[in-house]
From Swiss-Prot:
Residues 85-95 have a biased composition (Polar residues). This is Large envelope protein. It holds the Pfam family vMSA. The large envelope protein is synthesized with the pre-S region at the cytosolic side of the endoplasmic reticulum and, hence will be within the virion after budding. Therefore the pre-S region is not N-glycosylated. Later a post-translational translocation of N-terminal pre-S and TM1 domains occur in about 50% of proteins at the virion surface. These molecules change their topology by an unknown mechanism, resulting in exposure of pre-S region at virion surface. Keywords: Acetylation, Caveolin-mediated endocytosis of virus by host, Fusion of virus membrane with host endosomal membrane, Fusion of virus membrane with host membrane, Glycoprotein, Host-virus interaction, Lipoprotein, Membrane, Myristate, Transmembrane, Transmembrane helix, Viral attachment to host cell, Viral envelope protein, Viral penetration into host cytoplasm, Virion, Virus endocytosis by host, Virus entry into host cell. Residues 2-242, 192-242, 359-364 are intravirion. GO terms for cellular component: membrane; viral envelope; virion membrane. Residues 75-107 are annotated as: Disordered. One of its GO terms (biological process) is caveolin-mediated endocytosis of virus by host cell.
Amino acid sequence: MGQNLSTSNPLGFFPEHQLDPAFKANTNNPDWDFNPKKDYWPEATKVGAGAFGPGFTPPHGGLLGLSPQAQGILTTLPANPPPASTNRQSGRQPTPLSPPLRDTHPQAMQWNSTTFHQALQDPRVRGLYFPAGGSSSGTLNPVPNTASHISSVFSTTGDPAPNMENITSGFLGPLLVLQAGFFLLTKILTIPQSLDSWWTSLNFLGGAPVCLGQNSQSPTSNHSPTSCPPICPGYRWMCLRRFIIFLFILLLCLIFLLVLLDYQGMLPVCPLIPGSSTTSTGPCKTCTTPAQGTSLIPSCCCTKPSDGNCTCIPIPSSWAFAKFLWEWASVRFSWLSLLAPFVQWFAGLSPTVWLLAIWMMWYWGPNLYNILSPFIPLLPIFFCLWVYI
């Protein structure tokens, strides 16, 4: 190589060459390679049998190093004996290939013959066609059901899952009605309080309403007459006013119901006499056709004809009209029949008992309401559970 810096492989990346980082740069004979046996460039043109073929000997001993084999010198090496493990057969032998089915079971190739179906009775032949143990035709016995008896009791294979939508809707319906009922109840309870405030304001024109029956134990406790505490003497008068307001609201609801029934044609009317265009004469009687019959519109007679029909005026006495409304509601809401014994007992009370009950509610009702008010929301829940479960 000498001082020729353009020689091949100057940094000695091939075998048996070492790199000198300083390559004697500070000397008169700089060099990159520490190998003392490296070939000089003029010797690379000599003819010789090297690793790259005859006539070319690469510098530095060739790509494969300085060994005789690298320089193209062929030597005969003794062959090593094979390992001892290959001299004998040991362990599991490979599974031989299975012969074709047409050679082992020629009758199986005849698909439409009875011989093939008979051959399928052989478990070995069946395994070739139906590894899972199935059947190809209806002539074969089906695979027995391996399901346990306990599992067949609780569920049948293939049954669809229960419809959770129908199950949840049966509970969500009453709960939504209950929630709407509580919402309406809270709104309805504010109506008597507003009417009570308007009623008491009539006695205090031009001034703020102040309760005249203040508690003697606390003369300085001024309060509104619409929010008297139970210890105030004006508390019972407040309850009486609200009771009258409730009756007035019920009367308005009854009038609205009568107007609605009359608009829908469900009020009792007099039937026409067959063969005539006029109604029958006679006193107004109670309804003769109950609501559970074929017709939901009861028929009765009256003395005020109007275009062939007439409305029963006055409304049938006693409980006739209430009985009709009850029967009409019982047809549409079957669970109301469970309240029939209680309603019959309540309707059979004498007027004296009614007045006594009203007086007790007016006198002890506020105190009982304060005691039972935490449990009142539970009553509709228990009632729904009792009806639907």
